[in-house]
């Protein structure tokens, strides 16, 4: 996504990184105050003057030992929200990039490496961008909670999901599904002062949207009447994912083991311990990566996915 403003990359690439501004995102439904990522953005003029060599080197290095890579906020290769240093995200503006050159480099380097590229095309996206990425052979990202009909806001039927994408129930910018079902994402943002509406209104809207998904799961026979425990609902949600035409389906580690704590809260720096929340089971027992492979809950959810995907 970017580099630390005081890191080695920022020093070595200071000729092609903009100073006095940071990259971020404008306000949207889930981040009502916008986001400031505290990262210096690429300068499009200097990239072009240098034939995009620093960007090519970066993509080449990422793909050198990878069979696949996910590019966070890939829409930033089309236009990126620049925020004056010290100003709130709402004071930012979009700066355009030569997406033909930058996406072309990503596609070329991926082809050379024989790797798949997944772009996170979420947030404020221009309508044509997803089609453009697809035409260049890049997969998009579909998150269950965001997949709603454009007009009715009802859950998007499984058969109408995109084929060329990576689908998941959760994302790193949301709580694990157990926490999302409990409304943790609303309460956390309220406690951090990130909401622009009364918390009761946010909770009411959130409950309606989750209720619509539960009704859809029951309509499809994936969730029985009366079943509402988080483990049962999570299993049903992943079974739904497996019925979409998506080329790739992702199972979050946190969902696999039943953790509900938020790993990352957009729009925060020191206010929340982002990326410092160790993986744990529902009882709070810390888990190492090796523990996941012997975790009964994770094994059961993986088996459900395997059975649905293989028919």
Residue ranges and their predicted role:
Residues 2-250, 254-255, 270-271, 276-285:
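Alpha-amylase-like alpha-glycosidases and glucanotransferases acting on alpha-linked glucans and related
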């Amino acid at each position: 996504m970017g580099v630390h403003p005081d890191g080695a990359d920022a020093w070595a690439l200071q000729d092609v990184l903009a100073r006095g501004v940071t990259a971020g995102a404008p306000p949207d439904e889930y981040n009502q105050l916008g986001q400031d990522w505290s990262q210096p953005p690429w300068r499009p003029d200097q990239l072009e003057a240098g034939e995009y060599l620093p960007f090519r080197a970066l993509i080449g290095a990422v793909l050198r030992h990878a069979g696949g890579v996910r590019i966070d906020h890939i829409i930033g290769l089309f236009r990126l929200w620049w925020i004056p240093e010290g100003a709130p995200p709402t004071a930012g503006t979009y700066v355009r990039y030569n997406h033909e050159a930058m996406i072309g480099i990503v596609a070329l380097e991926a082809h050379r490496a024989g790797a798949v590229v997944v772009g996170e095309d979420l947030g404020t996206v221009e309508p044509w961008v997803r089609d453009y990425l697809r035409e260049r052979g890049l997969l998009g990202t579909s998150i269950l909670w965001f997949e709603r009909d454009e007009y009715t806001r009802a859950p998007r039927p499984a058969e109408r999901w995109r084929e060329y994408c990576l689908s998941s129930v959760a994302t790193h910018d949301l709580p694990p599904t157990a926490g999302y079902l409990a409304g943790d994402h609303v309460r956390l943002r309220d406690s951090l002062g990130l909401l622009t509406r009364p918390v009761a209104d946010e909770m009411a809207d959130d409950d309606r949207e989750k209720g619509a998904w539960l009704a859809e799961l029951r309509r499809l026979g994936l969730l029985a009447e009366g079943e509402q425990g988080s483990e049962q609902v999570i299993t049903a949600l992943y079974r739904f994912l497996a019925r979409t035409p998506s080329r790739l389906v992702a199972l979050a580690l946190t969902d696999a083991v039943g953790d509900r704590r938020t790993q990352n809260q957009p729009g925060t720096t020191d206010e929340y311990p982002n990326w410092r929340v160790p993986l744990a089971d529902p009882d709070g027992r810390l888990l190492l990566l090796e523990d996941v492979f012997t975790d009964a809950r994770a094994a059961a959810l993986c088996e459900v996915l395997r059975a649905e995907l293989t028919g």
